[in-house]
Amino acid sequence: MSVDNFRLDGKVALVTGSGRGIGAAIAIELGKRGANVVVNYSRAVAEANKVVETIIANGTKAIAIKADVGEIDQVAKMMDQAVEHFGQLDIVSSNAGLVSFGHLKDVTGDEFDRVFRVNTRGQFFVAREAYRHLSVGGRIILTSSNTASIKGVPKHAIYSGSKGAIDTFVRCMAIDAGDKKITVNAVAPGAIKTDMYAAVAREYIPGGDKFTDEQVDECAAWLSPLERVGLPADIGRVVCFLASDAAEWVSGKILGIDGGAFR
């Protein structure tokens, strides 16, 4: 297989929630491989503009578009704008999401709705609009989690459930999207060192609120036989593979990316 099959030259990608963290890394990695990129954000405008600057500095084109993925009309408008600006849309990576922790007895209806609005409903309609806007042979890449179906986590039912739905979406959407030769897959990250990593990682560790940042790192790294914590670029590189011609026969799959932590 030619290495060119991993390039994305001439492609246009849109990444939701890409102003920071994993989404930013996905957008930057797509740009490094030749794609022009739409950087979506909801509130982090300054951060999104920095991601755009980085992509442009690396040699491709990029724009930032504000949209709340929980609002269907905004999602549709964002993709209209992407096609209007670049003339096409080939790759949609749905990354925007919320995290939530809470014991079963304490979870409110408002919290349930807040999380499912973005993580589940939002991703469904991002995928729907992606299907409607993508060129034939396009790519839809959703975001699940390694807590969705592999391992239960205390006080994490709402988040894990919201991501578990993604696994089912992917399997069914891959069938529906086949008529446009569009592949549908998901990445399921484990512990990834983003700007919110230290605070969130403590929730997974019994007594983690008493751990130093270094101890949190050690604990997360211990779970992986590779003995390190994941980085946003680890996710970005896998998304780039799924977006490339090299993955044209991969569809309906959920790829766990956790360094072998859950096995």
From Swiss-Prot:
Which keywords does this Swiss-Prot/TrEMBL entry list? Cytoplasm, NADP, Oxidoreductase
Q: Localized where? A: Cytoplasm, Cytosol
Q: Which GO terms describe its cellular component?
A: cytosol
Source organism superkingdom: Eukaryota
Instruction: Give the metabolic or biological pathway.
Output: Mycotoxin biosynthesis
What happens biologically when this protein's gene is inactivated, per the record? Blocks the production of dothistromin and accumulates versicolorin A.
Gene Ontology molecular function = oxidoreductase activity, acting on CH-OH group of donors
Q: Mind telling me what this protein is named? A: Versicolorin reductase 1
- The species is Dothistroma septosporum (strain NZE10 / CBS 128990) (Red band needle blight fungus)
Source gene? ver1
